[in-house]
Amino acid sequence: SDYIIAVLAGSRNNMEREYDYKSKIFFNELGDFEKIGRDCSKNAIKKLHSKKIKTCKSDVIFDSKVSASLLRNLFAACNSQTIIKGISFLKNKIEKKVFNSEISIVDNPLMQKKLRSRVSDCEGIESKKKFLIKNGILQFFFNSLSSARQLNNQPTGHASRSVSSIPSVSYSNLYMKNGKISKKQMIKSIKKGLLVTELMGSSINYSNGDYSRGASGFWIENGEISFPVSEITIAGNLLDIFSTLIPAPDLEFNYGINAPSCLVENLTLGGK
């Protein structure tokens, strides 16, 4: 079961939209739709009369609505097909530190009532809980039987296919474990920075990790939300992003890939 909601808020010279999306195994886990609608409407109104900011470097908080995109980037770089092509910036990082030592990222196909749970992959390889990142260290690359043979690795049980396609490499329930510092505390700690609530577009070079995405959200000044912002470009390098990333304790399982809100230091923000 799933839902998607989109709300438009407008004034005479300005219009903004807010959306929410959630997917669960059981309908009764989707939540209170009236509350979801009210919250979405309030968030759309908060976005009205957004401003542009000057180009600068600052700390950035990726809200939990968008932080899973960083795990999608991590998965793409850890996909054995990318490794075989030699175009991953993580190709030589197995058993090396990629995140700080407090971070662990798990792929667990055996979780109850989760979207991508399974007992085996599509090639019959037994599914097991595996740490992709354990205490900051990269543990494995996702593979299928074919890509495992090409890399001379053991199969990890991550083959997936539709009825009409050949097996390809995928994940099961991939998530980053909770951190200790709340999003509210993160906001309070920032003198000037950005809370990202929406990402759009993508320009990511997986050969070297260069990262650039369009974004909108809210500007933070002196530890408080100051005003809505839009038409921003966030730029950095994924190795630097991963190494400085700090997760909050607000993980929710709403999709196949899930992550809590994340604070990342010293990213370039392109504005006016």
Q: Predicted regions span which residues?
A:
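N-terminal small-residue-enriched
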Residues: 1-272
